[in-house]
Swiss-Prot record:
It comes from the Archaea. The gene is hisC. Belongs to the class-II pyridoxal-phosphate-dependent aminotransferase family. Histidinol-phosphate aminotransferase subfamily. One of its GO terms (molecular function) is histidinol-phosphate transaminase activity. It comes from Methanococcus maripaludis (strain DSM 14266 / JCM 13030 / NBRC 101832 / S2 / LL). The keyword Acyltransferase does not apply. Pathway: Amino-acid biosynthesis; L-histidine biosynthesis; L-histidine from 5-phospho-alpha-D-ribose 1-diphosphate: step 7/9. This is Histidinol-phosphate aminotransferase. Keywords: Amino-acid biosynthesis, Aminotransferase, Histidine biosynthesis, Pyridoxal phosphate, Transferase. InterPro entries: Aminotransferase_I/II_large, HisP_aminotrans, PyrdxlP-dep_Trfase, PyrdxlP-dep_Trfase_major, PyrdxlP-dep_Trfase_small. The modification N6-(pyridoxal phosphate)lysine is found at residue 228. It catalyses: L-histidinol phosphate + 2-oxoglutarate = 3-(imidazol-4-yl)-2-oxopropyl phosphate + L-glutamate. HAMAP family: HisC_aminotrans_2. Its EC number is 2.6.1.9. Its cofactor is pyridoxal 5'-phosphate.
């Protein structure tokens, strides 16, 4: 008998997650100087994290032999001030918001329960739901309607077995927000937990921020992260804002020390450095417009409007997305091939914001490939 006979059948169905490519990988595979590589594939903050974090981390080195605080009061207070939400309604997790997603599935899902996921969207929702025994009911962001959420495709899938509904807004990878009235209709039509993923909400108009709904509705959990505008993707800190009851259940199964000392210090400092946050947000939106307007000039591309720090692009020059992305890689540009996203044809890629210099070089290289 081999280990294959012991592994759960659902795990055998999975394919490994395909992350955005790293500079190190491209330098190694294509022989390109890492300093010349433009990384626009992982929705990161190209200006990095707050410069004040380095000193704080150095001061923390002498404490690394000690376990971190399971719940850091200072971090909770800073998140509370940032979101204007009570500490009692906040749950913080390591591994970005992924830990919050996984823990929600752990407390909600029994074998055979149902989870509704509109696609294309962030792939981790389905992975986490399936591994905990859920049956996925697919709804859709309608490609023929600019990837607007098909609300009826969500509502028509709600049954007595529905335990959770995932709504990513702005949606990854399409970049569009879900209208507030559509989300309200879904939330008020079910007692299932509606997960509103706001990983990119800082880049959107303030009116689209529904974090306060965690106090208005018992069946809402809003996901937030430090990986995007705060520039802490490498520290893996995320959090959820939800009802006190949900927080209580999650605290019962939450990993005790999932947040390291370094990640806690980094997140606290990032929230306190409001000047750097505002700078990154302002320059990020400017960068988004720069890339969007530049790509719109190419007739062989269809560029979708966005409220995030990335945009979805459809290739219409006869190449599929993998061929197109490979051509960019050979010139030292990393974007995200979207072939692995359920619900997308193999002609889409996603491009993240960059610095002005990176954007200029990227658009020049694009002109060489497209025209």
């Amino acid at each position: 008998m081999s280990i294959d006979d012991k592994v759960r059948s659902i795990v055998k169905e999975f394919k490994a997650y395909v992350p955005g490519k790293s500079k190190e990988e491209i330098a190694r595979n294509y022989g390109i100087d890492p300093e010349r590589i433009i990384k626009l594939g992982s929705n990161e903050n190209p200006w990095g994290c707050s410069p004040k974090i380095e000193e704080k981390l150095l001061n923390e080195v002498s404490n690394l032999h000690q376990y971190p605080q399971p719940i850091n009061p200072e971090l909770m207070d800073e998140i509370s001030k940032f979101t204007k939400m009570p500490v009692e309604n906040i749950i913080v997790g390591g591994d970005g918001a992924d830990e919050v997603i996984d823990n929600i599935m752990r407390i909600l899902i029994d074998e055979g329960d149902e989870v509704i996921i509109p696609i294309p969207t962030f792939t981790q929702y389905a992975i986490s739901a399936k591994i905990h025994g859920a049956n996925i009911k697919w709804a859709k962001f309608d490609e023929e309607n600019g990837f607007k959420l098909d609300v009826e495709s969500v509502l028509n899938n709600i049954t007595e077995k529905t335990k959770a509904i995932f709504l990513c807004t702005p949606n990854n990878p399409t970049g569009n927000v879900i209208p507030t009235e559509d989300i309200k209709k879904i939330v008020e039509s079910t007692d299932a937990l509606v997960m509103i993923d706001h990983a990119y909400i800082e880049y959107s108009k303030e009116e689209y921020d529904l974090t306060s709904w965690a106090l208005k509705y018992d069946n809402v959990l809003v996901l937030r992260t430090f990986s995007k505008v705060f520039g802490l993707a490498g520290q893996r800190v995320g959090y959820g804002v939800t009802s006190k009851k949900v927080v209580d259940y999650m605290m019962r199964i939450k990993p005790i020390f999932s947040l390291t000392r370094a990640s806690q210090v980094s997140a606290i400092t990032a929230l306190q450095d409001k000047e750097f946050f505002e700078k990154c947000l302002k320059e990020g939106i400017e960068s988004r417009e720069e890339i969007y307007n530049g790509l719109k000039k190419f007739k062989q591309l269809e560029v979708y409007p966005t409220e995030a720090n990335y945009m979805l692009v459809k290739v219409k020059n006869g190449m599929n997305s993998s061929e197109f992305c490979e051509a960019l890689l050979k010139k030292g540009v990393i974007v995200r091939d979207c072939y692995s996203f359920e619900g997308l044809e193999p002609y889409y890629f996603r491009v993240s914001i960059g610095t002005s210099e990176e954007n200029e070089r990227f658009l020049k290289i694009m002109s060489e490939i497209v025209e």
